Amino acid sequence: MVNFEYNGIKISIFNENLKYQKNTPVQNRLSLGTYEKEEIVGVRNAISESDVVLDLGSSLGVTSCVIASLISDSSNLVAVEANPTLIENIKHNRDINNFLFDIKNAPVSYNNRIVNFNYNGLSLSGSIIRKKHLEGNDTAWGKYTSVNMETVTPLDLERQYNKKFTFLSCDIEGEEYDLLYYMFDYFKNFNAMVVEFHELYNDSKYNRKDIHQKYLPHFHITNIGQTSIFKKR
């Protein structure tokens, strides 16, 4: 296990989640201050202390813990991660910071269905969308695995945790397009959203520009790289 202080919070990464790396290793990104930098800058810019937050794609729980530190009650956050190998690491990072947010192990989508959730040893790569470029290199990135999982919707999560979400943080490796398109009537009422768009993995018929155009009547939208910040008009 390696330990860091990042954006004012404590972060630990289990050894098994350090074994496989792609491009700049996760621990180096934490040391350099670049880990999920765009998303965290967006969150800091858009969130309010009173927000009730839905964090989709928690990974190791870094952004989740940053969010928990910025809201007045850390229990007003639900962190969702579909990769089953990361859940204990998220719980550990939550607990060492004495946060109280809930953690849900499930893929999120706009409807309920059985999907193949795909992941390997990389903590940032799991997705409903199959990433063929990550297959066939088990030595470098770990075995590429597909497991049948049932999706949950944001409305399912509101009912399960008895919350009314007002803020979205979203990094779900391509599923964001369909989620935002088909759940427009739900998300248009949020106070703010911070969404990382994954152009290379977009199997949807919608693109980032389409999503922006759909939401522009309701939000001011700014971009930081691949991350879009939606703030209620």
Where are these regions (language model features)?
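Short phosphate-engaging motifs
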Residues: 86, 124, 175-179
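Glycine-rich adenosyl-binding loop in Rossmann-like folds that engage adenosine-containing cofactors
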Residues: 9, 13-39, 109-152, 156
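A short acidic, often aromatic-flanked loop/helix-cap motif at beta-alpha or helix-coil junctions
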Residues: 108-112, 227-230
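Active-site segment flanking the S-adenosylmethionine/decSAM binding pocket
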Residues: 52-60, 64, 146-203
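Short, well-ordered secondary-structure micro-motifs
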Residues: 114-116, 180, 205-206
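S-adenosyl-L-methionine
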Residues: 1-102, 141-142, 161, 199-233
